[in-house]
Curated annotation (Swiss-Prot):
GO cellular component: a single term: EMC complex
Regions annotated as coiled coil: none
Organism: Schizosaccharomyces pombe (strain 972 / ATCC 24843) (Fission yeast)
Protein name listed in UniProt: ER membrane protein complex subunit 3
Family: Belongs to the EMC3 family.
UniProt topology in membrane: Multi-pass membrane protein
Listed SMART domains: DUF106
Subcellular location as annotated: Cytoplasm; Membrane
Keyword Membrane: yes
Name of a matching Pfam family: EMC3_TMCO1
InterPro entries documented for this protein: EMC3 (IPR008568), EMC3/TMCO1 (IPR002809)
Length: 258
């Protein structure tokens, strides 16, 4: 097969500009996310108490095998009694109006708005970049990968190029865009830090989990009956088996090195 010789202008005016524009868009998206993100509402003492009790029950079910059987049993008794008695529940105001539609709850609306902001900051820039590449650089071959690939990768690396006999190692302009979209996470982490909105946007459509306070607030979704959640969790804790990895651990350790 005859080798292709690429014009150096493709590198200077197509390949590098696409990469630089995507890095710039990622930095702008990160800063726009910070500006548009509303600070999460502070939870009341009673709401935090409810969440912490449920978190303790979840943690016991997940990590019970790291405790001694008597420790597991003691925690089970405490959690079952606390979850069933309802003494950690937030006092309910009998005069407070109940929302007819759970979607009209303030927390639900706030979460939907945050999700819409994140989706907008992800979709709009990528739509603009895709339109720009399709309009000006459609059908361009930009680089050759230094390693061989099978034919299954042809549709991935040669998107927009309708040539059947072209070697799979060649990468088109649109495929170069997608490679940058999912491959610039390390660059964003170097420029913006590990927890940045630029790389998070490619994994999560929205800004959920961007702050620890917001992640904690997602434990109890709006409209859920917390008392029923606690009763259900009490049943889960009650059927938990007292299986511990620490039983006879001394004998197993001595037998291993004997």
């Amino acid at each position: 097969m005859q080798k292709l010789l690429l014009d150096p202008a493709l590198r200077n005016w197509v390949l590098l500009p696409i990469m630089f524009v995507m890095i710039l868009i990622g930095i702008l998206r990160h800063n726009a996310t910070i500006l548009l993100q509303s600070s999460p509402k502070k939870l009341s003492k009673e709401e935090i108490r409810e969440q912490r009790l449920l978190q303790r029950a979840y943690a016991l079910r997940a990590c019970s095998n790291s405790l001694l059987p008597e420790s597991i049993e003691a925690r089970k008794c405490f959690l079952i009694e606390s979850l069933k008695s309802g003494k950690y529940l937030k006092p309910v105001d009998p005069n407070a109006p109940k929302a007819a539609n759970p979607l009209m709850d303030d927390k639900t609306l706030e979460g939907l708005m945050e999700s819409m902001k994140g989706n907008m900051l992800m979709v709009v820039p990528q739509t603009i970049i895709m339109t720009w590449i399709n309009e000006f650089f459609s059908g361009f071959i930009l680089l050759k990968l230094p390693f061989p690939l099978t034919l299954r990768f042809k549709s991935i690396f040669q998107s927009g190029v309708a040539t059947q006999d072209l070697d799979v190692q060649w990468v088109s302009s649109i495929s170069w865009y997608f490679l940058n979209l999912f491959g610039l996470k390390s660059v964003y982490a170097l420029l913006l830090g590990e927890n940045n909105a630029a790389s998070n946007a490619t994994n999560e459509m929205g800004m959920a989990g961007f702050s620890s306070a917001a992640a904690t607030a997602q434990l109890i979704q709006p409209g859920q009956d917390i008392s029923k959640m606690m009763l259900s969790e009490a049943e889960n804790v009650q059927i938990l088996k007292n299986e511990s990895l620490l039983v006879d651990v001394e004998k197993r350790l001595l037998a291993q090195f004997a």
